[in-house]
Amino acid sequence: AGSMDSCSETGVCMKACSERIRQVENDNKCPAGECICTT
């Protein structure tokens, strides 16, 4: 398992999130190219 698609905590912006844990509607709160974690 790669650490790139795991989230350390909810609401954290990451460079790479797996589709099942990202919250697309909140990606705009993150820097460009990053996604927000929801788990």
Swiss-Prot record:
One MF term in the entry's GO annotations: potassium channel regulator activity
**Major place of residence:** secreted
Please provide the record's keywords in A-Z order. Disulfide bond, Ion channel impairing toxin, Potassium channel impairing toxin, Secreted, Toxin, Voltage-gated potassium channel impairing toxin
Q: Which N-terminal stretch is annotated as signal sequence?
A: none
Q: Does the keyword Secreted apply?
A: yes
Name the tissues where it is expressed: Expressed by the venom gland.
Other remarks on this protein: Negative results: does not inhibit rKv1.4/KCNA4 and the sodium channel rNav1.4/SCN4A.
Q: Quote the function comment for this protein.
A: Voltage-gated potassium channel inhibitor. 1 uM of the native toxin inhibits rat Kv1.2/KCNA2 (100% inhibition), and drosophila Shaker IR/Sh (100%), human Kv1.3/KCNA3 (83%), rat Kv1.1/KCNA1 (32%) and rat Kv1.6/KCNA6 (21%).
Protein name, per record: Potassium channel toxin alpha-KTx 31.1
Q: Which organism is it from?
A: Buthus occitanus tunetanus
